[in-house]
């Protein structure tokens, strides 16, 4: 049985991790433990690079907190231009898989608050009247009227981040390049 460390205690993120590991390894083949670790980036990361660093840092910190595990999973949501998205980082032994989620264009009323230093989740709570939005369906759930959720979008990206660990082509050595 695999021991999976989720570098989060957010239920929406843990549900996405559960769905992805169910799909790839099967229900009952792993156990997930959520740990609260720092991302090392601002609460609302701006740009793909900063967001990816946050996901990688979560994995690094989770490995320090729980070094005896099989997988470590970090998810960090961010904003780039007028889009929200997230980076998924999964490490297993000495290998890493990464994927970026689908993006959602945000309305100007939300972006204005973000430019003033507020988090997307806080802006969504004010505008929707739903507290703790980011631990539920997220902005994605509100804007798609539940057709997609934070969990469903992260689930898809996590499946992609898991590919290097179960697809045998990733395990093959690279052929050496011919001399020029």
UniProtKB/Swiss-Prot annotation:
GO MF terms, alphabetically ordered: ITPase activity; metal ion binding; nucleotide binding; ribonucleoside triphosphate phosphatase activity
Superkingdom of the organism of origin: Bacteria
Enzyme Commission number(s): 3.6.1.73
Keywords from the UniProt entry: Hydrolase, Magnesium, Manganese, Metal-binding, Nucleotide metabolism, Nucleotide-binding
Biological processes per GO annotation: nucleotide metabolic process; thiamine metabolic process
Keyword Magnesium tagged: yes
Requisite cofactors: Mg(2+); Mn(2+)
A Pfam family per the record: NTPase_I-T
Cofactor, free-text remark: Binds 1 divalent metal cation per subunit; can use either Mg(2+) or Mn(2+).
Catalytic activity of the protein: XTP + H2O = XDP + phosphate + H(+); ITP + H2O = IDP + phosphate + H(+)
Residues annotated to bind substrate: 8-13
Residues at which Mg(2+) binds: 38
Record-linked NCBIfam families: inosine/xanthosine triphosphatase, PRK05074.1
Described function: Phosphatase that hydrolyzes non-canonical purine nucleotides such as XTP and ITP to their respective diphosphate derivatives. Probably excludes non-canonical purines from DNA/RNA precursor pool, thus preventing their incorporation into DNA/RNA and avoiding chromosomal lesions.
Family designation: Belongs to the YjjX NTPase family.
Subunit structure: Homodimer.
Annotated protein name in UniProt: Inosine/xanthosine triphosphatase
Source organism of the structure: Yersinia pseudotuberculosis serotype O:1b (strain IP 31758)
